[in-house]
Every structure is written in structure tokens, then in C-alpha cells.
Amino acid sequence: SKIKFQMFIRLRANQIDMLNKRSEFLRAKFESKRILLTNEIGAQISMANNLFPYRISFSNYINTTDLRFFARYNFLGGLYIGDEEEGMIISYTVPGGIPIFHDISKPLLGKTKTSAPAIVFVGETGAGKTQLADLEAFQNMIFKGMKVLTVDPKGDREKKIKLLGDNAAHLKIGSKDCSSGMFDPYLMNQNDDREALGQAMRDIDSMLNVLGLSIDTNFRAIEKAHYDMLKDYENRIIHQKTLTYLISEKLVKYDKTTAEQVMTLANDSTMRLFFATQESRYDSAFNLTKPYNLITFEKMPSTAGEKMENDPNRLDNAIFAMLFSRVQGIIDGFMKRFSKQETIVVFDEYKVYQKTPGGEEVVDNVVRQARTLQTHPFLITQELSSISDAILNNVGEIFVGSLKSSKEIEFILEEMKLSNHPAVRGALIDHTQDEGVTEEKKYNFLMQDYNNRKC
């Protein structure tokens, strides 16, 4: 059988004569391999329709044009092979239309003033910050082979999962597809009883906090229950160690009140993930080894107030704090597993992490390990001012889209030392909801790169 494929080649030259020479040389090379350059016909037309949505057909074999002609159809159109410039084109300056070449690998290679690889994308809803972050992630995934892990509390990337098919993995925490007990400390640490015990102690302590009970955690009782369970496992009374068995069958003998109270959580739609049965199996979803990996949540947490005990959503927030502790373990495993190659970890809706107890620590942990584990953290938020100083001090690059808050605009201009530039201030004012606004005004971004340059 024959394999059919189509290549679309763009040649670059500063002069028409040189362009013609290169095209003739290329044509000769193709013909020597029995490959003829032809007009688009038949199957090629459908290919062109997919590549160029507006159906631009070419009447000549060679078209003389500029870079922007190609990039306006598809972000891949702005790419080319060669080392004349470094990086990939992500956008164009306004005004001027000068292509912006971007290489997120440079900080890790010591080729920039800052060695911090983290990037922050800021802007209002609809300003394009998520699209820009995903553009960066997908470009580097496709052309550099970087694996991507995205943690998205709002869960609006499912179309991308369907598009990528077998090249993507999706862990939707709390969904019906998640088996009960997938976060059970004994299932997650099957070969390390000591680590499993330590995690079980922390989990039970956190569960008492979830319930809001004024009960001191009896760690000694948990330890006794643990060793009793190990004996049952060695004697083959049970074939699997679980937190459920530890609490319901063993801890109840030493601390009945704690055991009975904690077991009431086993029926909660989310907390069931911490309670395995003898039939539960370690969830394969933790093997996030695809080019693109996504973690979402079936249920979004409410924003926690400063006084969590007075919050009517205290239970949900406390549960979500426990989930974040498990998410941190998943992210750490992903980063360490691929530490010999560059990876990207995307945190969308940063404010959710900030407002959920333990959430910001997850982000901070990734940012601090980024250089050591060759990771590029992407943080997406509506407010740069919401990011803690500890994290912001480890950010190397910032993209700022349109903003509604004048206070936030002033904070960013002060952070970037651009307070005396009224034109920049005007460009950041939100136009996403303006009637008849042009694309150029709607999706403008202020960029500060790894070398502290602004555009």
C-alpha cells in the first residue's frame, strides 16, 4: 500500500533573487527523489481547508509573502526550521508587528538574567490568558517533546482531551469514574508500611479537622491499630491493608469515638476516595505519562473566608484541603519521574489555591523545585497582586492582559517599573466587553521577559 502525505514548505530570503534560487534548488532536490511539486487538487484541498480555515488557494507553485501571512491562519504557521533566530513565535508587537521569539528553556540553560523558569499569565475573564498559556504549553509539547501537567479547578479543558485522544490523560477527582479508595494511604504506599502509617496518621488528624470536632488525635492508638492490621495481613486474614480496615476493625478497639466519627466520612462523595475496600485497586490514573495530562475536580471548592470556622462551606473547604495534599503528591511524582527532561506544570485559577488551606503550598512547592527538576511552572490568575511574595520572587516572566481594576493596573506597573508610562496604562484597561472592539485592542498583552525587557 502507498503512504500519502502532504508537505507545505516555506522558504525565507531577504531578496527575491535569492528566494528564486532557493526555490529552484529545492524543486530540483524534490524531482531527483521523484517528488513533484503540484497544485492543490483532490485530497490536498481538504488538507488545505484544515490548515487554512479561510480556504486560501495558491495558483503558483511559489508564493512570495511575509511571516505574518502564515501566522494569521494557525500558530504553527509562524514556525520555521533553522537557527537564525532562537525560540518560537508566540505573538507580534503592537504597534510594529514585529514577531516575538520566545524560548522557555533559556533560564534553565543559564542564558537569561534570571534563572527563574516560572511564568505568570494575568488578565480578566475573556482576556485570553488561558489561551496564551496553553499556546506556550502546546507549542513546547509538540515541537520540543515536553510533557505537560495541567491542574485546572474549573475544568474547562475537556475539549482538548478529546482532541488529543490517546495522547492525553485526564484524572477527574471526585467523579464516578474515580474508584473508592484511590487516595487510601495504604494503597498508595503498598511497599512502604512506615510511610503508609505516617500518612494514615496525618489523614485521620485532618479528618477530625474536617468534622470540626474538638477531639485530640490519639496517635498512639493509631499506631497500635496499624500493627494489629499488619498481623492480620501476615496471617492472611485480609489480603490488602486499607485505611478502612485500620479504622473500622482495629482503631475502634483503642479509640472508639474517633473511629466511629471518622468512618462517617466514608459515605461522602469525595471522602470515599480515602477509604479503600478489600476489592479496591490502586488507580492507574496516577500514571500520568502522556504528552498532555490534566487534573480537574468534579466539585469546585467555595472561596474560604479568613475565619474558616464561621464559613458555612467549612466542610467542603476542609475536604478540598485534603485533596490538595494528594494532588501535591501526584505533581511531585510527575516532576521527579521526568526530571531528566523539561516538563511544564500549569496551575489555572491561582486564586482557588490561594484561598484553599494548603493550596498555595502546592504551588510554592512546585515553583521552588522548578530549576532542580527542570520544570516550567505556569500560573494563570486574574490578579498578580494575589500571588505571595515568596512565589513572585521566583517568577521569571510575566504576561499581563486587560484588567478592570485600576488598583491592579497600578500594582503591575509599579512591579514592572512602568508607572510613568501612561500609554501602557491605557493599553491594560479592560476592553473585553466593549461593543465593536477590535481583536487588536481586546487581546493585547504586556510582556516582561526573562531579561527584564518589556513589550
What do these predicted regions represent?
Residues 35, 46-100, 155, 159-167, ...:
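P-loop NTPase motor domains
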